Amino acid sequence: MAAPALRAPLRWSGLALGVRCAVWNLPGLTQVRGSRYAPEFREPLIDKEYYRKPVAELTEEEKYDQELKKTQFIKAAAATETSSVFADPVISKFTNMMMKGGNKVLARSLMAQTLEAVKRKQFEKYRAASAEEQATIERNPYRIFHEALKNCEPVIGLVPILKGGHFYQVPVPLADRRRRFLAMKWMITECRENKPRRTLMPEKLSHELLEAFHNRGPVIKRKHNMHKMAEANRALAHYRWW
């Protein structure tokens, strides 16, 4: 009676192996991560200017593309994508990095309050300034935000490289995406760790943005410190092989 009991697992293992081989031979049956839509679905285009363009100004390729869209499937737009004039991918990225515990509603509210606080502070400064100084005061919070982040972006960074059993901090040039990430990370870290207990996040963040806008503040100092460390370790630049 023991032989049939041993044959049953062997039969099932052989069947599982056969199914696995069949799946490998048919890649269309394999599960792909995030394959919510079939390959024939096109990406959504969220751009009002594209749809407002007159037909007479369209090229032959654009006309063909619009005719093709009438018969093709289009993916649903993400909940975070919008065609609003206030939509900004950089601010959206900063909001996602500032979010904690998946509470994006709170992160959006804090970001909106921060931009409002920046605008209020600049308008107070604008009203108190003379006619000549008013022309030099920026009041657009979106421009202030972008300029502040640009001032915080480091040009060169340090990467640990193992050489002879020791890790050396080798200076390397940073990509644009990495620069923007470090600027956002430093700004958020400064507002969280060095914020007074009774100071709200929008107030602290608006203050740091205005400081960075004028090339001042701890975030700018942190960028300069990284540049100094990279300058001090420039003798190790030959360890960079990529």
From Swiss-Prot:
Source organism superkingdom? Eukaryota
Keyword Lyase in record: no
Where in the sequence is N6-acetyllysine found?
K228
Q: Which gene encodes it?
A: Mrps7
What Pfam families does UniProt report for this protein, alphabetically? Ribosomal_S7
Q: What is this protein called?
A: Small ribosomal subunit protein uS7m
Query: Which positions carry the signal peptide feature in this UniProt record?
Result: none
The biological processes this protein is annotated with in GO are: mitochondrial translation; translation
| Gene Ontology molecular function terms on file | structural constituent of ribosome
According to its UniProt entry, this protein's organism is: Mus musculus
Give UniProt keywords alphabetically.
Acetylation, Mitochondrion, Ribonucleoprotein, Ribosomal protein, Transit peptide
Localization of this protein: Mitochondrion
Record's family? Belongs to the universal ribosomal protein uS7 family.
Write out the GO cellular component annotations.
Answer: mitochondrial inner membrane; mitochondrial small ribosomal subunit; mitochondrion
Self-association state and partner proteins as the record states = Component of the mitochondrial ribosome small subunit (28S) which comprises a 12S rRNA and about 30 distinct proteins.
Question: In its keyword annotation, does this UniProt entry include Ribonucleoprotein?
Answer: yes
What residue range does the UniProt record give for the transit peptide? 1-37
